[in-house]
Amino acid sequence: MVCIPCIVIPVLLWIYKKFLEPYIYPLVSPFVSRIWPKKAIQESNDTNKGKVDCKGADMNGLPTKGPTEISDKKED
């Protein structure tokens, strides 16, 4: 059985997005743009962007140094 808020909240969000936001957003956006005038993310000209050094880790992200075996046996 699905809880009531799991049904009601998405419906209310859809109603807001479809009918209320076109009227509310133009009224609120000038105030928001005054509060946050700058862009949140600034691009950098880093040439190494996207290159990752994976030499110290195994394919699943575990370090390669030391034992990597995980036993399923319960130890007392």
Swiss-Prot record:
GO cellular component: endoplasmic reticulum; lipid droplet
Post-translational modification: Undergoes ER-associated degradation (ERAD).
Keyword Iron set for record: no
Keywords carried by this UniProt record: Endoplasmic reticulum, Lipid droplet
Annotated region described as Disordered, given as residue ranges: 45-76
Region (Necessary for its localzation to the endoplasmic reticulum and lipid droplets): 1-37
Basic and acidic residues bias: start-end ranges: 46-56
Pfam families, alphabetized: DUF4512
Subcellular location: Endoplasmic reticulum; Lipid droplet
Family matches, as InterPro entries: UPF0729_C18orf32-like (IPR026776)
Record note on quaternary structure: Interacts with DERL1 and AMFR.
Function, as annotated: May activate the NF-kappa-B signaling pathway.
Family statement drawn from the similarity comment of this UniProt entry: Belongs to the UPF0729 family.
Identification of the protein by name: UPF0729 protein C18orf32 homolog
Taxon lineage: Eukaryota, Metazoa, Chordata, Craniata, Vertebrata
